[in-house]
Design a protein with these regions (language model features):
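Active-site-adjacent structural elements that line small-molecule/cofactor binding pockets in enzymes
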Residues: 1-155
C-alpha cells in the first residue's frame, strides 16, 4: 500500500492534472500474495515468493521501490550476485522483514482481513491469483467472496 500511496497515486494525479481529465483512472492491484489454505501452504508460498522477489529486485526497474522502503543497497547486492552467477544465494538476502513489508501474508481464512487492512479504501479492485490445484477452487471461492466485500477507493 505504501507504493500505491507514495509513488503510484501522486504520479496518476499528476497525469490526470496534466491531461485535464475529470477523474482519476481506476487502480487495480495485482500484488503477489504469500498465502495458502493452511500454515504449511503459507510457508511454501513464502519460499516461492522469496525466490521470485530476489530475482525481481535484482533488476534496476525495482530500485525505486527498494529505496522507498529503506533498502537502497539490496538491489545492487542482488545484481552483483546475478552477474556472478550466484543464483542459489539470492533468496538469502530476501529477509522475512522484506517479505512481510511488501507482500500480504496469511492463510485463506485470514486473507480478507489482511487485504482490507492493506488495500481497503485505497484501490478500486484486487487481482487475486487462484490456486494451482483446481480441487481447492470451491474452498478458495469462499475467500474470494469475502475479499469481494473489501471497501473500494472513494474519490
Amino acid at each position: 500500500p505504501r507504493f500505491v500511496r507514495e509513488l503510484a497515486m501522486p504520479a496518476l494525479d499528476s497525469g490526470v492534472e496534466q491531461a485535464r481529465r475529470p477523474d482519476r483512472p481506476r487502480i487495480i492491484t495485482a500484488s503477489p500474495l504469500i498465502t495458502g489454505p493452511d500454515v504449511d501452504a503459507v510457508d511454501r508460498s513464502r519460499q516461492t515468493q522469496r525466490a521470485v522477489l530476489a530475482f525481481l529486485y535484482s533488476t534496476p526497474a525495482y530500485q525505486r521501490t527498494l529505496e522507498l522502503f529503506g533498502w537502497p543497497e539490496l538491489g545492487p547486492r542482488l545484481r552483483t550476485m546475478t552477474r556472478n552467477g550466484d543464483w542459489a544465494s539470492l533468496g538469502a538476502l530476501m529477509t522475512d522483514e522484506v517479505l512481510d513489508t511488501v507482500l500480504p501474508t496469511g492463510t485463506w481464512d485470514q486473507l480478507p482481513d489482511i487485504l482490507e487492512g492493506w488495500y481497503g479504501g485505497l484501490v478500486d479492485g484486487l487481482l487475486i491469483q487462484p490456486p494451482e490445484d483446481p480441487s481447492l477452487d470451491a474452498r478458495f471461492s469462499e475467500t474470494l467472496r469475502a475479499i469481494g466485500s473489501i471497501r473500494p477507493r472513494l474519490d
